[in-house]
């Protein structure tokens, strides 16, 4: 059927697939390097405990049948290997059905991880990667030209990502409507990057322009994705430019990058397509059936978008096939950070020798400049930001985190930048205190070299020791 394929988008498909495989690789690498302390058998929220109380139908996963740290590591590293093979173009060397099965592997593996990932995998970009990855299975390889309906599904997904984010802002915090949110956002965002301090200190009129441009990109430009070329390519380019601006302004895991990847599928490159065979009938039937299913399931996110009680980052099915998205419906005006400290003193005193644990990405030492980590995702650091917003976010895991520090747990300490205690000599007590952080001014930066100024607010976790721990004299 001639209308079924769009040969002019063969290069867009190639670029999209290779870029998506890179995002998959980062996601699996993040899982492989961090899971043991977070989700492992002795993790902060162990998978075995989770699967005991959550049935397969609510959280389908390979780990519902069996879990071990070795099996999880094997799945994560296998995901890395398959993703690397896809980056290298292995799918182009396989028959069409083989390429589709190969693309199904990272989706199934990552679904298994996300569905047991609990609070550590509760971010919108997890579902976004899964939804994008599922659609990508049906894009085909060099044997056939890209199917029109799959290209449409990718645009439909990109539309929901951008338009949903725009709507949640207009319905949420009043500062988005007043164009003032960026007076605070760069300072209070979850994980600032190396340029965030400078973004915060841009002139306020420029902040207004930033917010207005963001509204146009998220509320107007998405409709242009469904217009003829070259307008659709221009719309995609505007979205890519906006996302790259966000990449410079902070660490948002791979959220910005996978949005860029989706936009790349819209671009029509001025290159003649190679010859490709007609799509086999079985492929047409499968693609059309999947497209019909996804469009039917889309009624739920559409209903959510038009609702005045719109929610963001919600999955409507356990396979994460069609989801709703959004970001920063509300913006914090004040930044709080939980500072974790330990002491080797025999008794905890306020004026004792308390030493601070340093995190990789979370602000801590006021003189330490934020680093660039995205698209790599520091899950513990992100959840520490939520913990500072409310202890309720940290309820399931923070006490266990303190316990692991007292035990000198190697896996947990590897998530941190530095422990103030030498290996084998953990602290007797651990405590946590809440501080208010603000960016220094240009003058303060020149005089002190510090990018942050912090003020003590209150105790977060009182001095705690291991239950039944013997005195060490």
Q: Predicted regions: what is each one?
A:
Residues 1-473:
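Alpha-helical membrane-anchoring segments
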């Amino acid at each position: 059927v001639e209308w079924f394929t769009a040969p002019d988008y063969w290069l867009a498909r190639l670029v999209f697939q290779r870029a998506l495989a890179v995002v998959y690789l980062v996601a699996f690498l993040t899982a492989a390097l961090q899971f043991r302390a977070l989700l492992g058998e002795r993790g902060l929220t162990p998978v075995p405990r989770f699967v005991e109380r959550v049935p397969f139908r609510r959280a389908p996963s390979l780990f519902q049948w069996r879990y071990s740290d070795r099996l999880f590591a094997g799945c994560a590293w296998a995901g890395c290997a398959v993703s690397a093979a896809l980056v290298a173009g292995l799918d182009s060397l396989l028959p069409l059905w083989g390429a589709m099965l190969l693309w199904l592997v990272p989706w199934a593996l990552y679904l298994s991880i996300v569905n047991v990932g609990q609070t550590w995998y509760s971010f919108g970009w997890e579902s976004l990667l899964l939804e994008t990855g599922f659609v990508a299975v049906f894009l085909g390889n060099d044997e056939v030209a890209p199917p029109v309906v799959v290209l449409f599904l990718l645009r439909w997904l990109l539309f929901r990502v951008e338009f949903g984010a725009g709507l949640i802002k207009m319905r949420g915090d009043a500062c988005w409507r007043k164009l003032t949110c960026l007076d605070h956002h760069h300072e209070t965002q979850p994980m600032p990057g190396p340029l965030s301090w400078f973004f915060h200190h841009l002139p306020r009129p420029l902040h207004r322009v930033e917010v207005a441009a963001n509204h146009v990109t998220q509320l107007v430009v998405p409709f242009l994705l469904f217009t003829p070329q070259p307008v659709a390519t221009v719309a995609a380019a505007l979205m890519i430019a906006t996302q790259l601006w966000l990449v410079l302004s902070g660490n948002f895991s791979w959220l910005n990058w996978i949005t860029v990847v989706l936009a790349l599928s819209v671009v029509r490159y001025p290159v003649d397509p190679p010859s490709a065979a007609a799509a086999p009938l079985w492929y047409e039937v499968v693609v059309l059936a999947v497209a019909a299913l996804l469009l039917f399931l889309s009624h739920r996110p559409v209903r959510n978008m038009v609702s005045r009680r719109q929610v963001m980052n919600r999955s409507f099915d356990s396979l994460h096939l069609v989801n709703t998205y959004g970001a920063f419906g509300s913006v914090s005006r004040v930044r709080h950070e939980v500072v974790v400290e330990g002491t080797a003193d025999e008794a905890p005193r306020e004026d004792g020798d308390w030493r601070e644990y340093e995190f990789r990405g979370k602000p801590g030492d006021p003189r330490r400049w934020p680093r660039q980590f995205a698209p790599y995702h520091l899950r513990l650091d992100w959840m520490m930001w939520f913990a500072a917003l409310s202890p309720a976010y940290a309820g399931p895991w923070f006490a266990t985190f303190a316990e692991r520090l007292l035990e000198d747990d190697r896996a947990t300490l590897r998530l941190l930048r530095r422990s103030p205690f030498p290996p084998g000599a953990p602290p007797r007590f651990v405590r946590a205190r809440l501080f208010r952080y603000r960016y220094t001014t240009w003058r303060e930066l020149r005089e002190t070299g510090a990018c942050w100024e912090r003020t003590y607010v209150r105790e977060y976790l009182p001095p705690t020791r291991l239950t039944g721990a013997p005195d060490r004299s």
